[in-house]
Amino acid sequence: MAANLLRAGFPLSLYNRSPGRDEVVAALAGLDSGAAADAPAVGGDATAAVADAEVACLCLSDDVAVRAVMEGGVIDALPRGALVVDFSTITPATSRHLAAVLQEGGLEYIDAPVTGGTEGARRGTLSVLVGGEPAAVARARPLLEVVGDRITHLGPVGAGQEAKAVNQVLVAGSYAAVAEAMALGSRLGLPMERVVEALKAGAAGSWALEHRAQQMLEHRFPLGFRLALHRKDLAIALQAAEAVQLTLPITAGVAALEDSLIAAGHGDEDVSALARWFRA
């Protein structure tokens, strides 16, 4: 996502909690990070990275990380009038809390979690689920249109996170269904590559079938989205459902499967590692 912004001409100042990621961004953008005039500036810490920012983008793993970075000095370091675009997937409550705190300091905030996997991030074809004031969303739109090809404003702050929870419920069910289906077809001795091609053209067609079925059949799980992070997202979805007195039995079942895989050491693999469960 950062590399696409850099290619599009946005001047970037980067900070990542994992050292060296600035070099990865420069390489993905086709730049020589040591010599290119438009290579990203690298902040020694998060506060340095945002000191002159008109827009600050976050993409962190969870609520704890987002609050640690924001409340660890970033809020105070941001220039008055700056806009925070939060691509992280976190609870709606944390998004609303941050928006309120930032507003008190003359700052704006939108939640903008994304879906589309690593493939979509690299291609700039993510779907961006946005919550925030219309003026703030309009201000962010030129940037959002670089990282995604579908930008959907869903309501006030927190609405983007709620929509992302809905998305992750669908991901849970679809990935688990594809894993089950691949296991059944394989046990029946069917020519599964041909079966998958046939099913893609019918009512069972889905993103998970299109992009993950073959990997499941080959028992390889190159990282698109970490299983452990998806489990974190399911916790958000289950919490949201509980708040509105709704039971999600399919999601709860997939969460239990993911718990068992994480306990077995597979949390850093792609969500498609759900297929491992059916080989146990």
Protein language model features and the residues they cover:
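Active-site-proximal catalytic alpha-helix in oxidoreductases
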Residues: 123-124, 128-131, 156-188, 199-211, ...
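Rossmann-fold NAD(P) dinucleotide-binding segment
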Residues: 46-109
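Residues in the short beta-alpha loop(s) of Rossmann-like NAD(P)-binding domains
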Residues: 17-18, 62, 133
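Hydrophobic residues within alpha-helices
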Residues: 1-5, 98, 143, 184
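Interdomain hinge/lid region at the active-site interface
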Residues: 161, 205-271, 278-280
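NAD(P)+-binding Rossmann beta1-loop-alpha1 motif at the extreme N-terminus of oxidoreductases
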Residues: 1-58, 82, 87-88, 118
